[in-house]
Amino acid sequence: MPALRKHPQTATKHLFVTGGVVSSLGKGLTGSSLGQLLTARGLQVTMQKLDPYLNVDPGTMNPFQHGEVFVTEDGAETDLDVGHYERFLDRNLSGSANVTTGQIYSSVIAKERRGEYLGDTVQVIPHITDEIKSRILAMAAPDEHGNRPDVVITEVGGTVGDIESLPFLEAARQVRHEVGRENCFFLHCSLVPYMAPSGELKTKPTQHSVAALRSIGIQPDALILRCDRDVPEALKNKIALMCDVDIDGVISTPDAPSIYDIPKVLHREELDAYVVRRLNLPFRDVDWTQWNDLLKRVHEPHETVRIALVGKYIDLSDAYLSVTEALRAGGFFHHAKVEMRWVASDDCELDSGAAAALADVDGVLIPGGFGIRGIEGKIGAISYARKRGLPVLGLCLGLQCIVIEAARSVGITGANSAEFDPATPDPVISTMADQRDAVAGAADLGGTMRLGAYPAVLEEDSIVARAYQATEVSERHRHRYEVNNAYRDRIAESGLRFSGTSPDGHLVEFVEYDAEQHPFLVGTQAHPELKSRPTRPHPLFAAFIGAALDYKAAERLPVEIPEQRSNGVELLQEPASRG
């Protein structure tokens, strides 16, 4: 009789997170929170998202359908859940953290064309599933420091029963077979709905969801029961029996006051302890020092600050997920709660509209975006805030709108972006040289922007240099357009300072007004929100929230900002009260 195959106990463990009954149960936050707990126990954890859509990446998808595109350090356009992973694990991930059906099929078809399958009939099994497995197992490779992860948490997108998810679930099943059951863990998230007329929690949807998962060969090791209230022990015992799961693996996760409370909820239910026992992982007790400090800042703020986010996609808050999380983290830094005011950019085109929307806020954030819709409203919001000393932070497109507004204020009345008006006589924002083919339709749009981390050099004693406490920084980018250097001198007449550029001085990365002219009006071509962490707020957002708190505390009349006419004569704006 042949010897039984043995799997090394020191192998990287693989934990898969699946979902059933309905989508949007919080698989990503559940996996991120569990990853945070395992990290706090001294383990090396990395994460991955498997997305079952045919797009190669979300870069060309409508923000209303998909939410934000999260850009990694290496320039990959990924799912917003990757942002949750980075924020909860407090580590940078790469493009390999997001795998889509489009990537898998593109790779397999390319290999077939190269003849790598030696004449085989290319099929979903084994060729597609093998490609998926290779992406999953590659996450166990050592990082740049030679450290191999103890645990890889892989979230399988979609819902059990979806046709699109089947190849990913089959690949996950095969991974368990290859690495050994003792090195693999399946965590299934399911809905336990509350029926108000009968006053009952219903377990049948979870039973059917687990039955569907078992029908394709996967027996979950633990269940996350999502509900608006605690699931009582009697129902947990029933679910454990009917779904053949250890009672220790049946986890009640009622809605939490904050996403940052979820690790505490999972720890209270002892999920992390169950996982480390089941996978035979070395561990220590959870170190709550940093997370408890965060929760104190979340739940016991000393003051409140109101920030207006003037955007184009405000009907879906996920379109600005990293921005809102970075703003909240900036508030945590100051022991302050950030109240979001969602403002449709179209509402701010006229000064009266901007006044109605922004009169009682303490700061204005202009986020990124694409296309002409709502642009004049963003510019109108900047103009309103500039004339009243209201703190402003512009991101990517926000910087470009700040530059356009400054140019118009000194008489360049036709100032615009080549993106919004290709025929503008004054393209103060122009197409980057290496992006012209893509803009003209002569090259692919997907994956061709200026993506990923790029360095910038900051002017000493500038607002941004003081915020960063450095003159050399690196931020992530996602854009095709840049400030037109031919207009720099004329725009500078407005007082706008180009306080940060690429190392060669060519590309404008940061702009600001001197503090004597405006307390805080700063723009960056980058997306600093992508590097913010709840426990390590981004310095630019911390500085912005600090300026907003100062503005609120002063309760002053807005400062008089000199408006430059094209002939160089100053025109003072009439001061107006905040209210």
UniProtKB/Swiss-Prot annotation:
Active-site positions on this chain: C396 (nucleophile), H527, E529
Pathway(s) per entry: Pyrimidine metabolism; CTP biosynthesis via de novo pathway; CTP from UDP: step 2/2
Binding-site positions, ATP: S24, L25, G26, K27, G28, L29, D81
* Residues annotated to bind L-glutamine: G369, L397, G398, L399, Q400, E419, R480
What EC number is given for this enzyme?
6.3.4.2
Which UniProt keywords are present, listed alphabetically? Answer: ATP-binding, Glutamine amidotransferase, Ligase, Magnesium, Metal-binding, Nucleotide-binding, Pyrimidine biosynthesis
Any further remarks? CTPSs have evolved a hybrid strategy for distinguishing between UTP and CTP. The overlapping regions of the product feedback inhibitory and substrate sites recognize a common feature in both compounds, the triphosphate moiety. To differentiate isosteric substrate and product pyrimidine rings, an additional pocket far from the expected kinase/ligase catalytic site, specifically recognizes the cytosine and ribose portions of the product inhibitor.
Recorded hits in HAMAP family, A to Z, give:
PyrG
- Spell out the protein name for this chain: CTP synthase
- What is the species listed in this Swiss-Prot or TrEMBL entry? Mycobacterium sp. (strain KMS)
Q: Which gene encodes it?
A: pyrG
